[in-house]
Amino acid sequence: MKMNISDKLQERYGKSHLSYSSLKQALGDMAQFDRYMKGELKYQSDALDFGTLYDMLLFEREQAFEKYVVLSDSAIMSRLSDKAKASKKPSMTLEYKSALASMKEEALEEGKTIVSHDDWQMANDMIDRLATCGLLDTYLAGDYQVGFLEELNGIQVKGFLDCLGSNFISDSKSARSAEKFRYAVRDFSYDIQAYIYTKVFGIKDFYWVVQEKTYPYLPALVKCSEQTLFTGEMKFNDAVSRIRKFLTDDYEPTTDYLEYEV
């Protein structure tokens, strides 16, 4: 009798589903998968923070205005003494840094996030470019941030897709290079994401709307090919097999290692 992965996941981690992120971890180090499922693996970077801002302005614009506090230099300067304001570089003074820390703390207490004026402006300028080229009203038109918890190949999968169109699914990505995004699909296993979404919603056409983060913010419409979907399916099955073995054998994850041929 085949082991019920959902039951084992619930028993070990207190949740019975997998996600794109957890499946991606399972393709690498099972110790990382174990940490991710326990909530111990936290990623934070300027790129991730900007991506969150960009997506919220794109798909949940009203919420973005509630969540973010745009930090301007003038707002910080207004809190400084005349002496600090008159210094050669006010931003290098302890008073300036203290005022900045206070503003961040105040935002945190209100459940808000501080964002620089430059990042806020850039995200909005990027979205303006999407509108100008027509992608915003076509391949980013539909229902936004659609959540799901469904069974796929006997496994419970959970996730959120960016945009559910009338006959397509699209996912927004900001990137350094729109042309080189094809390599990111492989390296970050975005193909697994595409496979899960298309299967769960029964929609064949999946697109990435990619946009460069440097001016003039070149956008690209990248269609997911059948070959890429097939690769995503193979990765999905491989990850599930690794997770099944890990849960069945109940081994110490740090004893895990990769084995492959090139």
Predicted regions and their residues:
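Mg2+/Mn2+-dependent nuclease catalytic core
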Residues: 141-142, 146-234
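Metal-dependent nuclease catalytic cores that hydrolyze phosphodiester bonds in DNA/RNA
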Residues: 1-158, 255-262
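Short cationic/low-complexity microdomains
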Residues: 29, 229-240
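Short helix-capping/linker segments at secondary-structure and domain boundaries
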Residues: 60-66, 202-205, 248
